Amino acid sequence: MPPCYPFLLSWEGWARDPPGRPGGAMRAHIITYGCQMNEYDSHLVASELVSLGWELVDSVEEADFVLVNTCAVRGKPVEKVRSLLGQLRKEKERRGLLIGMMGCLAQLDEGQQMAKKFGVDVLLGPGALTSLPEALKANERFWDLTFREDVLDYIPPPPKGALSAHVTIIRGCNHHCTYCIVPTTRGPEVSRHPDLILKEIELLKQAGVVEVTLLGQNVNSYGKDQPGFPSFAELLRMVGGMGIPRVRFLTSHPVNFTDDIIEAIAETPAICRYIHLPVQSGSDRVLRRMAREYRRAHYLERIRKIREALPDAVLSTDIIVGFPGETEEDFQETLSLYDEVGYDQAYMFIYSPRPGTPAYKHFQDLPREVKVERLMRLIEKQKEWSYRRNLEWVGKTVEVLVRGEAKEEGFVQGHDRGNHPVLVPASQAPVPGLYQVEIKQATPHLLFGEVVGAEAPAPIPLPVA
């Protein structure tokens, strides 16, 4: 493996004179839709903007430049972007607002047509984020949809005051599920150099970060595209030995979730025993139409291996309900899979047809009322399992990363190593950080606890489940 010499984002500052503020810094506002990868990319470009002399502001009204980081995985975020761009165009006509668009939707013809319609000035695909300095210097409409190799080379500065952070380790996806647009928008898998990953994590550690999440469309494939790179299991061991108290990863693919990964988790205390393993459907017939490359038996065998090596593992999954051609019998197989696995958590979605995918081209969609009805049944099934699993934690002491105020009055909220949301009395955890918490009560969606050794709080009415 050749050496890699990491460098931080440090472009020379450049900014035009803002209207009405000659000589002042231009102001930018970033709006992010979608996954944690998009959140990481937004942090990266925010760092770019600051290094260029821009000021980041909290609202569209304050901004000279609004950059929208888009998602194209489902139809709902696409429509949100369409609506937002319509509003931004009015601001552009009124006061000369500069509009930028990045992310997965920008890579698609659908997004590019939106950009033309709504007067987008800067359009960057997910692989072209490092073109931003050039785009802002152009002083004219700038579009870049290339996949630049240097997009993986930059190390953004640690987010100020953050206790947790994301670190991208691989971009793109080599799987071609028939419903998914990601291989089109983000390209094939490209692993980031391990020197860069470790350098970024070391900087986060020095900045006080106590929890790092390794990100990728398929983190399990890390290193396979680059001879001499460590495997994902080896990378987990390396990161787990750096002194960061908590290490997580997202997202995995059942085909690539191999035994050596399970062993690395079991043998590395810093790796959280929270495993998100998307199944999408419990029906082999539907999995075949989805081109998921595994079948129910293989998935359940992976779950068995995980349970054997990690009996305290917390499992979550993704489910698509109402995929084209899904029958009631197919759906019943998904429900029965739930009972075999007993997921702690699940992210459940109605199938959303995406232009450009094989499923969109070749399969006829199911009636919406059928999809909604099945989703409601699945949600009830998951609610039952979540409550059952959460009750198992009552009376146990867990480590909770408290991050800030909860919506529930009198509480602060954090999450344990199993990614359960945990509420504790605000008086017991006055500042964000890691606390030992005894779980006192559970609902299907929340755990309630008290900080070990803290003075008993005055009774606080618990929210109704």
Swiss-Prot record:
This is tRNA-2-methylthio-N(6)-dimethylallyladenosine synthase. Its EC number is 2.8.4.3. It comes from Thermus thermophilus (strain ATCC 27634 / DSM 579 / HB8). Monomer. Its cofactor is [4Fe-4S] cluster. Residues 26-141 form the MTTase N-terminal domain. Keywords: 4Fe-4S, Cytoplasm, Iron, Iron-sulfur, Metal-binding, S-adenosyl-L-methionine, Transferase, tRNA processing. Residues 391-453 form the TRAM domain. [4Fe-4S] cluster 2 binds at C173, C177, C180. Residues 159-388 form the Radical SAM core domain. [4Fe-4S] cluster 1 binds at C35, C71, C104. PROSITE patterns: MTTASE_N (PS51449), MTTASE_RADICAL (PS01278), RADICAL_SAM (PS51918), TRAM (PS50926). NCBIfam families: miaB-methiolase, MiaB/RimO family radical SAM methylthiotransferase. SMART domains: Elp3. It catalyses: N(6)-dimethylallyladenosine(37) in tRNA + (sulfur carrier)-SH + AH2 + 2 S-adenosyl-L-methionine = 2-methylsulfanyl-N(6)-dimethylallyladenosine(37) in tRNA + (sulfur carrier)-H + 5'-deoxyadenosine + L-methionine + A + S-adenosyl-L-homocysteine + 2 H(+). Belongs to the methylthiotransferase family. MiaB subfamily. Catalyzes the methylthiolation of N6-(dimethylallyl)adenosine (i(6)A), leading to the formation of 2-methylthio-N6-(dimethylallyl)adenosine (ms(2)i(6)A) at position 37 in tRNAs that read codons beginning with uridine. It is an enzyme of class 2 (transferase). The keyword DNA-binding does not apply. One of its GO terms (cellular component) is cytosol. It is found in: Cytoplasm. GO terms for molecular function: 4 iron, 4 sulfur cluster binding; metal ion binding; N6-isopentenyladenosine methylthiotransferase activity.
